[in-house]
UniProtKB/Swiss-Prot annotation:
Gene: rlmH
Highest classification ranks of the organism: Bacteria, Pseudomonadati, Pseudomonadota, Alphaproteobacteria, Rhodobacterales
Top-level enzyme category: transferase
Gene Ontology cellular component annotations, sorted alphabetically: cytoplasm
Organism name: Roseobacter denitrificans (strain ATCC 33942 / OCh 114) (Erythrobacter sp. (strain OCh 114))
Function recorded in the entry: Specifically methylates the pseudouridine at position 1915 (m3Psi1915) in 23S rRNA.
Pfam family, one: SPOUT_MTase
UniProt-annotated binding residues for S-adenosyl-L-methionine: L72, G104, L123, G124, K125, M126, V127, W128
Protein name in the entry: Ribosomal RNA large subunit methyltransferase H
Classification via InterPro entries: Alpha/beta_knot_MTases, RlmH-like, tRNA_m1G_MTases_N
Subcellular location, record wording: Cytoplasm
Length: 156
């Protein structure tokens, strides 16, 4: 199952981008044998004054046809890392070829796009900067693959 992290805004060179690259490289290595990956980041333009509706249109265009859509949203479901790993495995086992993990801009996900999504995931009750959400999501993908592979990265 190919993973597409689709996010508003361009991440400049720096520690966040380096961390994302590191975690997605690790995910590619550990996920391959599990039928997960590769994962890639797709960035859409951050239209400062365009509003969430315009961002949603750009995000929709970046989502592959037929992909399962999971939005990152503070109102979404909070899951443990093992539960998220099992959810990924379940989607993979359903034969889903593509998973779009969608991250909105500073104002979040447009309500209409949220309603269209197959799933809404929250990384906790706190609100996180959308640029950091990418790093946290990339790490959780790697952690999920490690859990599914029985590797010692995740500790209960």
């Amino acid at each position: 199952m190919r993973i597409h992290i689709i996010a508003v805004g361009r991440l400049r060179a720096g520690p966040e981008k380096d961390l994302i690259g590191d975690y997605l490289t690790r995910f590619a290595r550990s996920g391959r044998a599990l039928g997960l990956g590769p994962a890639r980041v797709v960035e859409v333009e951050d239209r400062k004054n365009g509003g969430m509706g315009n961002e949603a249109a750009l995000l929709r265009r970046a989502i592959p046809d037929g992909a399962l859509i999971a939005v990152l949203d503070e109102r979404g479901r909070v899951e443990s890392s093992p539960d998220f790993a099992q959810r990924l495995a379940g989607w993979r086992d359903q034969g889903r070829g593509d998973l779009a993990l969608v991250i909105g801009g500073a104002d979040g996900i447009d309500p209409a796009l949220r309603a269209e999504a197959d799933f809404a995931l929250s990384l906790g009750k706190m609100v996180w900067p959308h640029m950091l959400v990418r790093v946290m999501l990339a790490e959780q993908l790697y952690r999920a693959a490690s859990i599914l592979a029985g590797a010692p990265y995740h500790r209960n």
